[in-house]
Design a protein with these regions (language model features):
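Flexible "arm" and connector segments at domain edges
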Residues: 1-57, 61-119
Length: 119
């Protein structure tokens, strides 16, 4: 079973399923979801143990994927496209001057997600 299926199962269990085209969330639901994301991010910021960090990371991804699900996005295909574009990047110096930085090489193209967003 995939994480995406887990997200679908969770939302179906609580009668929150959505199986339509990509959509904007109603303002109240969007505000709730964004608040929920910030709450989980705050848990990550204040985490003091590796266990707390891991829990916060999983919760954050879970809520974000749930939000994508409720918007009707094909998250798996979007992930595939973004991953492919990221794999075309290279490691090198950037304006941030971080040794861990990954940069967009000459000719790099961002993934087109417009069809998945219904635009």
């Amino acid at each position: 079973m995939s994480q995406w299926q887990d997200i679908k199962d969770f939302h179906e269990k609580f009668a929150l399923s959505y199986d339509g085209p990509p959509r904007d969330l109603p303002t109240d639901l969007s505000s709730f979801r964004l608040g929920f994301i910030f709450e989980e991010l705050d848990e990550l910021i204040v985490a003091e143990t590796k266990t707390e960090v891991l829990d916060a990371l999983v919760d954050l991804v879970y809520v974000i994927m749930g939000t994508a699900y409720l918007q009707g996005f094909d998250f798996q295909e979007a992930w595939r496209r973004v991953h492919a574009a990221n794999m075309a990047k290279t490691r090198g110096p950037s304006a941030r001057s971080q040794e861990y930085d990954i940069i967009k090489p000459e000719g790099w193209t961002a993934p087109d997600l417009s069809d998945l967003a219904g635009e």
